[in-house]
Amino acid sequence: MIVSRRLLLGAAVVLAGSGSYLLGRSTPKEDTIADPDAYAAKLGRQQGLTIGFGDPSTFYAPPYLPVDAPVEGVVLSPADRTAVKDSLHGISKAFEAYPEQCLGRIIKAIFIAGKILIDGAEAGGTYGLDWIFLAAPSNVSAETRRLTAELGVHHETSSFIWLRNDALQRAFTALEPAGWQFQNSATDQIARNGQTAPPVETGFLSAYGATTSENDFNTYAEIVFSDPGRLIKLAESVPLIAKKLALTLDSYIAVDARLHETFARNGLLKAAGR
C-alpha cells in the first residue's frame, strides 16, 4: 500500500499553505441539490465518469468486480446524504477547471464516503484501482466538505497521472533537494503537515508536499487547477518551481491536449517557460 496517496482532511491542510485562498473564496450558494443521485449522474456525464456514494462495498467500476472494491489498509464508512450534497458542490466546482470528458480519461469513478481511515489515520481522500475516494464526514462544516471534495478531485486524480508516467517520476524526483528526508507512514506525514513549510527555494509548496515525491506532485497539481495565480507568482520568482510546474503541465497535456489552451489562457504556460 502507498500511504502517501491521501488528501489530508480539512480545508486548511489541503491548501498547500495558502491561507489567502480560503479568505478569498466566495460564500457557497444555498444548497439546491434536491436529488443527489440525479445530480451525481449529471456531473458524471460531464466528465465521462461515475460518481457514487452509499455502501462502500459498491465502490468499484466496470470492468472491475466487487472483489476489487476494498483497498488494503483503508476503511470507508457510508456518507450521510446531506453531507454528500456538500461534496457534490465541491466536485462540481472542481470540474470547472477541466475540459468536458477530461477526467474520464484519467479515472473511471469518484466515490464519496463518510470517514476515510488509512492505517487508522483520518484522511480527506485516497484512491483505488481506477477511481478516487473523497471523505464527507458529518462532524465537519459544510464548507470543509465542499473544499475537501473540490481539492480532492485535483489531488487524488493527479496520483494516476504520477503513477502511470515513469518519466515524470524520474524528472520530478531529480529536482528534489539532495538528501531530503521523506516520510513513509501516514502518521508521520500528518505530523509533518503541522510543521512550518520549507522555504520555497526547496521547490516544495507546503509542509505536506515535502513528505513524499508523490505528495509534492499532488500539491502542484492541486494548485494548478485551484489557484493558478499563486503558482504563477511563485514560478516567476523561483526557477525550480517553474521547472516543476512545467513538468506538471506537460504531464496533463499529454493526457488531454485541450489543456494546453487552458494553461495558456490562465498564464501557467508562460510562467513555466513553455
Residue ranges of each PLM-predicted region?
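Hydrophobic alpha-helical membrane-insertion segments, chiefly the h-region
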Residues: 15-24
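Auxiliary, metal-adjacent structural segments of Zn-dependent hydrolase domains
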Residues: 71-129
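Active-site-flanking segments in enzyme catalytic domains
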Residues: 107-274
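N-terminal export leaders
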Residues: 8-9
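Short, Lys/Arg-rich N-terminal segment immediately upstream of the first membrane anchor
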Residues: 1-4
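Non-catalytic architectural context of zinc metalloproteases
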Residues: 23-83, 112, 187-198, 210, ...
